[in-house]
């Protein structure tokens, strides 16, 4: 074994794929299979939201992610498509700095705004159906010769000598695993409902912590959100929170009223002041840290994976 990757969310899987497809022998060790990781609760439209660090570094990683996800949208079975959508607000709204990478960003027309909203931005971007995408990533990793072991890691020190290269993609679990006191979980709860025919995603940018209203259509279903609850480690869905989520989404998209509720998901976004992507000596080998992507893990994962692969292979 050349590389041991810890974690099988989107960040761990893309890192493992980038190394395995380069010809290295890679094993993933994970506390839960991909479909049970935080990644499954992601929306997930491209955009490194709530990711900390220098903007130029985030833009570089995000650009790679945008390119890879856009290419995957042309392939069947990946769970990725190019979707149109809007970010709206009741107050003047500046676009995120990373939207400069989107070629068709434009102000919303008045007819495109929900009732009571005064401004917003319209664009197209990759939209990811996470259960399908995670299955695709796992299959791609295994086709490249990778192995996945469901076995929790209690301490990084137990892995010294396990492989010449160990990559820590443990997400919020890095708080205790490293340990990293700068690691803060940001709890996100979402509701899965039957889609009444909505085609465009919609995000309400009005701040109302810990609430954030968004909806992401995925064919016959639609993902409704959500929460940004900092410091909350609870991974069980709350019926009261779910009720508030649905009400918020109905408030900006009345077609959702009465939609059948199909399920609930909870994930812990791994936030820290700066994404941690760096290497350190580890026994006779090297330990890479690749975690702390906040709400931008799907968007940044391919760029971070490429940076690790370049270094390991050089």
Describe each model-derived feature in a short phrase:
Residues 14, 160-247, 252-260:
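Flavin-dependent oxidoreductases
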Residues 80-84, 148-149, 254-266:
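A short coil-to-beta-strand element that immediately follows conserved catalytic motifs
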Residues 136, 259-314:
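C-terminal catalytic lobe of FAD-dependent flavoproteins
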Residues 44-118:
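Dinucleotide-binding Rossmann-like beta1-alpha1 core, especially the glycine-rich loop
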Residues 2-27:
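N-terminal Rossmann-like FAD-binding beta1-loop-alpha1 element of flavoenzymes
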Residues 117, 121-154, 160-163, 169:
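Helical element adjacent to the flavin cofactor pocket in flavoenzyme catalytic cores
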Residues 53-64, 120-136, 236-241, 299-300:
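Short beta-strand to alpha-helix junction loop
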Residues 21-40:
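Glycine-rich FAD pyrophosphate-binding loop
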């Amino acid at each position: 074994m050349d590389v041991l990757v810890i974690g099988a969310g989107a960040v761990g899987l893309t890192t493992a794929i980038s190394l395995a497809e380069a010809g290295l022998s890679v094993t993933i060790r994970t506390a839960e299979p991909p479909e049970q990781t935080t990644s499954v609760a992601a929306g997930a439209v491209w955009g490194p939201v709530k990711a900390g660090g220098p903007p130029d570094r985030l833009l570089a990683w995000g650009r790679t992610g945008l390119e890879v996800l856009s290419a995957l949208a042309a392939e069947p079975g990946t769970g990725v498509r190019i979707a149109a959508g809007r970010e709206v607000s009741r107050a003047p709204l500046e676009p995120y700095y990373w939207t400069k990478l989107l070629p068709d960003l434009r102000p919303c027309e008045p007819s495109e705004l929900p009732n009571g909203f005064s401004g917003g931005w319209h664009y197209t971007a990759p939209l990811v159906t996470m259960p399908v995408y995670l299955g695709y990533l796992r299959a791609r990793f295994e086709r490249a010769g990778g192995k996945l072991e469901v076995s929790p890691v209690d301490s990084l020190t137990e892995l010294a000598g396990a492989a010449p290269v160990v990559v820590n993609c443990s997400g919020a679990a890095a708080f205790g695993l490293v340990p990293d006191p700068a690691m803060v979980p940001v709890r996100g709860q979402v509701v899965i409902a039957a889609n009444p025919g909505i085609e465009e995603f919609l995000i309400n940018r009005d701040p109302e912590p810990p609430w954030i209203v968004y909806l992401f259509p995925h064919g016959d279903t639609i993902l409704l959100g959500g929460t940004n609850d900092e410091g909350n480690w609870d991974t069980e869905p709350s019926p009261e929170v779910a009720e508030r989520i649905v009400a918020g989404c109905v408030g900006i998209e009345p077609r959702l009223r009465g939609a059948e509720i199909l399920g609930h998901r909870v994930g812990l976004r791994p936030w820290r002041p700066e994404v941690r992507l760096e290497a350190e000596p580890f026994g006779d080998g090297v330990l890479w840290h690749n975690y702390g992507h906040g709400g931008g893990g799907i968007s940044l994962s391919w760029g971070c994976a490429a940076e690790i692969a370049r270094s390991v292979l050089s």
